Every structure is written in structure tokens, then in C-alpha cells.
């Protein structure tokens, strides 16, 4: 008698769930995992889907759940090198023979259809290699087909109605739970009925394992009823004395060969979905070995505002994308010039034509082209600058710009100050200090740079960009030569400082105590210095009196700071400090002039 093996059908949802579990849960863990599959009555096909990894809540009539084991290998070499014959024998002994001998088969007869599924996932290309085996012994059992000797025509409705797939028929033709088999005398001839996985003319793989069970339990003979939807088959089993044989059961591929199968989901997935998953892949791989405690969600959901869409803004935005940041907003009031594309990677030559496109909007469009799933926008806005006075005709416009800037900072979690001038950084620094927003300032010179964090209050309040100044910033943009108007720097310095800025933000999101306050770098000798500085009580931007004045008077304070030279210095105490220094009388030295002669 020949037997029809199970075939496998793995739905796309199974592979997607497996990929997610491999990336987020299993990682490098290749230990056996419990999974399940289902077969529909008389179809003979084990179906795997996303529910294969969890307990199935419902049990449809005519659908049988089969328990199994998943072995997911970390490399294709491990998959290929596994001893498939020994593997099937090992799991046949564990899953089937073990369950029969320890008695768990009586409570879980579905183990008779248990399977082993070995897989390898190429998460970069979304290619999955797999091989399913339903272990059974290659034994020549004494099986004979016999005629229907009882009134079993209603089994096709009675068994599914009980929510069972295997039952025992007692001598009075009553359908009883399979667990009753445990109490049947071994000298008796039990009758076992089950929902056949195959059509009536075929003998399912399950019969082999029922024969093994009867043999191990010590029965002399038994009757099996293969229950079909319209017709039943009856088989009579008798115990033999022959060898049990070796384990078999690996599924053949579509070419009829004993080889694994392969599925490529790449062409079936939405390209945007593939891009999103690829971004997550590179980040989540960090958690496999190097940084298992890394919190990726915090920075991912950090809404970032970039004030400045030039060289620094371009590089910062790319690094934020690489960290998986979902929302990036650009603010700039310039247009793309012909000198920009070679230094600012978000722009192209065509962006410079016809007077140049607006930088902020163009940067957002370029970022969207790189990663379409990012939420990004560009806003053309001039940041009000201390020392740049307003006129009666410009006051309304500047006031609107101020209101929009405040609204933007309030609606974001982290602010990057990436502008060209010191005075343009002053107002955002004040607002971030007042609103306690994470703020990263980056500035570059010809061969030097500084990048620092501030804005968020802590146990030890850190200084801001202006805490080392003894004067408030003023208009530094007038009366400047060409080399002073342009940012003249070594080309490699912008990517360095931008990378540092984003990494400092990431460290802040992780609450890492090692996150530096500021880094100062010098390319003339290729050195970087880590510095910590406390907040200056007379700082023109983050001192308590300045912050409180902004909270109390908002635009009134800002308007005065823009128009009245010396107002901020008087308010924060810098002017008083300067007067105190001027009044110091250093006097004459006690030694005579001759004593200092060499």
C-alpha cells in the first residue's frame, strides 16, 4: 500500500511574520521554536500563515491544526550543512515516539501529523529557503482494506461537530474522545476514526504514524476509519514482527526531487514597504550583538526641526534618515546657488537654474526622493536676528516670522541650529531654553568646528552656544568681504560635525550619561576635545532672567532685543559685568621698571 505525503503551502504572511520575528525577537537565537500549520479536510496540504506563530483562537469545522517545530538557521551554509536525515530522525523520536511513550499522544492526537520546518531568511533580499518534513517510519505495515461493517455514515458530521479530528469508536458505535484509547485493553481491537487529509482513493501519511502508535502501545490489531466528506475508507491493521525501518518524510520540491524550496517575496512587496523594512533592518541588526539595549523607537519618533538647509542641514538630515527618524522639517530663507550642489548633497545642478529653487522646499523634496516614507516639509522663513532692527514697514512681517518660528519649535522635539551667523542662532536658543527643547548647535570654521547640546534642564544645567560670550551677538553680516560672506571651510569638516550632532542627539534619546556636552575639533592637527561647561548666569540667551523675560513678554521682548542695541546686555547683567571690569584699578607694580629689563 502506498501513502500520500503532505505537501506544504507557505503564505506570504508566514514569511513576513517570520522575517519580523527573526529581526526583532529571534535575532541570533537558532533554538527550536513551536509553530503550527493547518490542513483542510481531504486537501492534504499543510498551510502556514501568520497565525502559525501563535495559539489559534478558532477551530473551523473540517480544519485540522498540526503542531510542529521550526528551526531557523542563521546562515545558508548552516542550512545546507545540516544532516537532514539525522535531523528528521531526531525530531521523529522527540515529537512522535516520545509523545506516544509518555502518553501525551492521548490528549494531543494531532501530534500524529507533527512536522519539522527548517528555514533560512535572507532579510536583505527577502528570499526564504525552507524544507518541510513530516517524520514517519519507513515500515511495511500489515494493512488491508476492508468493507464497511458498521453504521458510520454520519461520522463526517459528528466528528467536526465535536471539534475533534481523531476519535475512538467504542463497541456500541459511539464516538468518544481519543483519550479513551489509553484505557482500551491492549488485547482488544480498537477502532480509530480521523478526518482524512487526502481524498478517499489515497492513503494519507497519517496512517503510518497511527500504525507506529498502535505498535508502540502494544495492540495486536486495530481498525482505522478514514473519514471523508462523502465516503469513508476502512483499513485493518495487524501487528507484525518486521523491522520498523528508518525515519523518512522530507517533502519533494516541484521537480519531484528531495530538495528544499525557495520563495522570493521581493517582487511581491510594495517598493515603499521594502525601503522601510530595509531601513529598519540596518538599525535593528545593531541590537543583535553590539547594542542589545538600544532604544530605536525614541529617536525614530523624535520630530526634528533643522534651522538651516545648507551644508550642515544636508548632512544632518541624511544622518537622521539613517537613524530611522520619521519627521524632518527644514527652515531656510535662501535659494540654491551654483556653488551649493558640490558641497550640499541634497541639491543638484538643475536646482540652481532660473535664479535657484528655494532651499528648504528643495531639500524636503530631495529627502523624499531618497526615502519616500519620511514625513518632511520645507518652510521658507527668515529667523529674526538680534541686532537686525525692524522698521515700521517690516515689523509686521518680522512679527509673523517670529510667531511661525515659535510654533515650529513647539511642534518639534529636537531643534538643530545650523545657520551661518551667530545672531541667527540667538532667538532659537532663547526659545529652546524656555520651552526645554533638545537643541543641538553646530558651527564650522575653516578647519575647526564646535557641536554642542543645550536647551534641556538637568541636574547640572549645561551652557549654550552663547555662555562663553561677554557681549551679546550683534549684526555681523554687514561690511563683509566676499571670503567673509561665504562659508569657507575644508570640505570634509561638515560631514564630521553633522555626524557628531546627530550622534549626540541619539545619545540624549538613550539617556546615555556619556553623551558629551560639546565637542570641539581641529583639522589642522586632527584632534577632537570633549568639553563640559555650565550655564553662565549672565548668558545673553539662556540665563534665567532672559528666559523669564521671553516667557513674560514674548514678542515685546524680542522686538526690543532686535531694535535696541545694548538692551539684552543690560538685562542679563553682561553690561554690569563689563562696567565692573572697567572700574578695576590694577595700579602700578611694586617693582621698578629696571627690574623688568632683560
Swiss-Prot record:
GO MF term set: Atg12 activating enzyme activity; Atg8 activating enzyme activity
Presence of the UniProt keyword Protein transport in the record: yes
Motif window: GXGXXG motif: 308-313
InterPro entries: Atg7, Atg7_N, Atg7_N_1, Atg7_N_2, ThiF/MoeB/HesA, ThiF_NAD_FAD-bd, Ubiquitin-activating_enz
Localization (cell): Cytoplasm; Preautophagosomal structure
GO CC entries: cytoplasm; phagophore assembly site
Keywords linked to the UniProt accession: Autophagy, Cytoplasm, Protein transport, Transport, Ubl conjugation pathway
Subunit architecture: Homodimer.
UniProt free text on domains: The GxGxxG motif is important for the function, possibly through binding with ATP.
Designated name of the protein: Ubiquitin-like modifier-activating enzyme ATG7
Protein's gene: ATG7
Amino acid at each position: 500500500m502506498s501513502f500520500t505525503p503532505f505537501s506544504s503551502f507557505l503564505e506570504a504572511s508566514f514569511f513576513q511574520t517570520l522575517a519580523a520575528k527573526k529581526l526583532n525577537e529571534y535575532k541570533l537565537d537558532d533554538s527550536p521554536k513551536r509553530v503550527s500549520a493547518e490542513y483542510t479536510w481531504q486537501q492534504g496540504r499543510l498551510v502556514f500563515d501568520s497565525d502559525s506563530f501563535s495559539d489559534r483562537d478558532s477551530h473551523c469545522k473540517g480544519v485540522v491544526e498540526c503542531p510542529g517545530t521550526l528551526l531557523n538557521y542563521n546562515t545558508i551554509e548552516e542550512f545546507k550543512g545540516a544532516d537532514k536525515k539525522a535531523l528528521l530522525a531526531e525530531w521523529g523520536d522527540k515529537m512522535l515516539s516520545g509523545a506516544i511513550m509518555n502518553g501525551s499522544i492521548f490528549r494531543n492526537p494531532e501530534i500524529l501529523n507533527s512536522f519539522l520546518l527548517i528555514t533560512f531568511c535572507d532579510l536583505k533580499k527577502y528570499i526564504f529557503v525552507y524544507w518541510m518534513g513530516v517524520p514517519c517510519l519507513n515500515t511495511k505495515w500489515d494493512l488491508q482494506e476492508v468493507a464497511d461493517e458498521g453504521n458510520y455514515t454520519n461520522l463526517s458530521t459528528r466528528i467536526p461537530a465535536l471539534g475533534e479530528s481523531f476519535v475512538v469508536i467504542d463497541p456500541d458505535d459511539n464516538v468518544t474522545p481519543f483519550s479513551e484509547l489509553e484505557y482500551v485493553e491492549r488485547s482488544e481491537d480498537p477502532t480509530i476514526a480521523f478526518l482524512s487529509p487526502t481524498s478517499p482513493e489515497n492513503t494519507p501519511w497519517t496512517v503510518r504514524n497511527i500504525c507506529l502508535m498502535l505498535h508502540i502501545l502494544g495492540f495486536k490489531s486495530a481498525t482505522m476509519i478514514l473519514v471523508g466528506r462523502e465516503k469513508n475508507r476502512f483499513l485493518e491493521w495487524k501487528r507484525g514482527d518486521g523491522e520498523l525501518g528508518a525515519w523518512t518524510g522530507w517533502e519533494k520540491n516541484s521537480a519531484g526531487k528531495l530538495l528544499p524550496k525557495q520563495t522570493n517575496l521581493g517582487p511581491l512587496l510594495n517598493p515603499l514597504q521594502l525601503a522601510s523594512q530595509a531601513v529598519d533592518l540596518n538599525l535593528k541588526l545593531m541590537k543583535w550583538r553590539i547594542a542589545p539595549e538600544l532604544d530605536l523607537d525614541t529617536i525614530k519618533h523624535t520630530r526634528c526641526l533643522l534651522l538651516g538647509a545648507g551644508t550642515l542641514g544636508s548632512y544632518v538630515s541624511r544622518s537622521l534618515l539613517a537613524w530611522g527618524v520619521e519627521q524632518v522639517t527644514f527652515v531656510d530663507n535662501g535659494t540654491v546657488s551654483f556653488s551649493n550642489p558640490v558641497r550640499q548633497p541634497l541639491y543638484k545642478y538643475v536646482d540652481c537654474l532660473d535664479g535657484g529653487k528655494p532651499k528648504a522646499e528643495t531639500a524636503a523634496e530631495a529627502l523624499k526622493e531618497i526615502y519616500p516614507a519620511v514625513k518632511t516639509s520645507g518652510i521658507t522663513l527668515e529667523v529674526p536676528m538680534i541686532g537686525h532692527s525692524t522698521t515700521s514697514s517690516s515689523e509686521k512681517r518680522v512679527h509673523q516670522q517670529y510667531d511661525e518660528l515659535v510654533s515650529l519649535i513647539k511642534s518639534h522635539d529636537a531643534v538643530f541650529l545650523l545657520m551661518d551667523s551667530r545672531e541667527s542662532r540667538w532667538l532659537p536658543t532663547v526659545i529652546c531654553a524656555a520651552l526645554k527643547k533638545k537643541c543641538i548647535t553646530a558651527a564650522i570654521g575653516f578647519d575647526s568646528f564646535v557641536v554642542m547640546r543645550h536647551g534641556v534642564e538637568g541636574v547640572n544645567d549645561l551652557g549654550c552656544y552663547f555662555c562663553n560670550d561677554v557681549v551679546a551677538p550683534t549684526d555681523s553680516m554687514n561690511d563683509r568681504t566676499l571670503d567673509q560672506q561665504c562659508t569657507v571651510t575644508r570640505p570634509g569638516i561638515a560631514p564630521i560635525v553633522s555626524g557628531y550632532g546627530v550622534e549626540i542627539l541619539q545619545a540624549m534619546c538613550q539617556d546615555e550619561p556619556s553623551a558629551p556636552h560639546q565637542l570641539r575639533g581641529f583639522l589642522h592637527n586632527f584632534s577632537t576635545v570633549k568639553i563640559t561647561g555650565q550655564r553662565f548666569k549672565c548668558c545673553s540667551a539662556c540665563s534665567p532672567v532672559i528666559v523669564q523675560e521671553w516667557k513674560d513678554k514674548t514678542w515685546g521682548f524680542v522686538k526690543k532685543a532686535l531694535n535696541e542695541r545694548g538692551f539684552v546686555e543690560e538685562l542679563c547683567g553682561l553690561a554690569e559685568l563689563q562696567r565692573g571690569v572697567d572700574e578695576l584699578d590694577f595700579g602700578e607694580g611694586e617693582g621698578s621698571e629696571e627690574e623688568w629689563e632683560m
